């Protein structure tokens, strides 16, 4: 697949969307691409569609602008991030039929290649890691890097899962060099979530 910048030529309006019950990688990749467009292609009118994004990711730039219900309009381009199949598309599912072009950027080996263009890297830790390789690194701002780092951290289990590779670490290092507050991101995006999950599990076991 070409770099995102090449694909955007001729695009005036586009939608960015993720899967049902979006996690950190889904939210991070969607908002990372959204921020990249705001920074480098402000002439493109872009909308992000996510189904009830979790509040622990509200620190991410662009979070408040996410649309949680679908506006059935015809976009020049619809980009699906971290969505392995058409059945997994969230609120944006109706947009595909009217889109001028559809692209899926994903890392799941189960991806069904349901879009016109499908860029899938099963060995990647996350959709954010895949997306990083499709962006012009020198054009990635700190807010964009913050979103991408969030996705990598959550889907790699803070670099503990087997999907973590040397390439994952190099991408994370490149994002850190953009100035991301990595300690806060790890705390907010991963450990706070884990703490809450443990509390819920504890209450369930007591009951």
Feature names for model-found ranges:
Residues 42-45, 71-74, 98-101, 137-142:
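Short, glycine- and charge-enriched coil/turn segments that flank and shape catalytic ligand pockets
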Residues 14-74:
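Anionic-ligand anchoring segments at beta-strand to alpha-helix junctions in alpha/beta enzyme folds, i.e.
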Residues 22, 26, 83-85, 109, ...:
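Short, glycine/acidic-enriched loop or turn micro-motifs at the edges of active sites
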Residues 61-117:
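Active-site cofactor/cluster-binding pocket
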Residues 1-17, 32-38, 112-207:
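A structured phosphate/pyrophosphate-recognition subdomain
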Residues 23, 33, 57, 79, ...:
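Divalent metal-coordination and catalytic microenvironments
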Residues 49-51, 81, 105-107, 122, ...:
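Generic beta-sheet signal
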Residues 27-31, 90, 165:
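Conserved strand-to-helix beginnings and helix N-cap segments that scaffold or border functional pockets
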